[in-house]
Amino acid sequence: MNLFQRVKYNFEESIKTKTAAIELLVDPIVQAGELMSQCLLNEHKILSCGNGGSAADAQHFSSEMLNRFETERPSFPALALTTDASTVTAIANDYSYAEVFSKQIAGLGSTGDILLAISTSGHSKNILQAITAAHIRGMNVVALTGRDGGELFTLLGTDDIEIRVPAESTARIQETHALIIHCLCDIIDRKLIPSSEDH
């Protein structure tokens, strides 16, 4: 396979993954978007976390909330727990990397808030501890996962929502997570900003 064929292959595999996900994920994406919309209507906030590419996804979601997606609107309260290098490194140094998100949630999370937890494997210890901390604070969890959901799946409660991409490849899962994040942003805009229905 030459490089041109490889690029074409990657496009085709990404399209196949998204196509396979459509019927499986529409319902949980809508449910998650409605849950997030109600959270914001009730003047609560959305915290997000992830590692590596998933950290970038967490920041992507937060930036769309604080700035805007495709509709002019006020800022919505959202915070990516991945962005404060001083806090993350202090917790990792003094305690452990597994606690870099859970300790922030203990200080920042409140009942009625939502945690957007993103993990392609479902096994990242800091994400697992973040979910436990969110439950202690009375928060619901929206989890973006892949593969078999990992240990993360076993921690979710009946009021939590898992959006699991049916793929094994980390790259394909992350590409679909980006689309899911845009779908969530679009739902929130349409639920909270009536004029966005026209676009």
UniProtKB/Swiss-Prot annotation:
GO terms for biological process: carbohydrate metabolic process; D-glycero-D-manno-heptose 7-phosphate biosynthetic process. Zn(2+) binds at H60, E64, Q174, H182. Binds 1 zinc ion per subunit. Substrate binds at N51, G52, G53, E64, N93, D94, S119, T120, S121, S124, Q174. It catalyses: 2 D-sedoheptulose 7-phosphate = D-glycero-alpha-D-manno-heptose 7-phosphate + D-glycero-beta-D-manno-heptose 7-phosphate. It is an enzyme of class 5 (isomerase). It is found in: Cytoplasm. InterPro entries: GmhA/DiaA, Phosphoheptose_Isoase, SIS_dom, SIS_dom_sf, SIS_GmhA/DiaA_subfam. Pathway: Carbohydrate biosynthesis; D-glycero-D-manno-heptose 7-phosphate biosynthesis; D-glycero-alpha-D-manno-heptose 7-phosphate and D-glycero-beta-D-manno-heptose 7-phosphate from sedoheptulose 7-phosphate: step 1/1. One of its GO terms (molecular function) is carbohydrate derivative binding. Its EC number is 5.3.1.28. Keywords: Carbohydrate metabolism, Cytoplasm, Isomerase, Metal-binding, Zinc. HAMAP family: GmhA. NCBIfam families: PRK13936.1. Catalyzes the isomerization of sedoheptulose 7-phosphate in D-glycero-D-manno-heptose 7-phosphate. Homotetramer. Belongs to the SIS family. GmhA subfamily. The reaction produces a racemic mixture of D-glycero-alpha-D-manno-heptose 7-phosphate and D-glycero-beta-D-manno-heptose 7-phosphate. This is Phosphoheptose isomerase. The lineage of its organism: Bacteria, Pseudomonadati, Pseudomonadota, Gammaproteobacteria, Legionellales. The gene is gmhA.
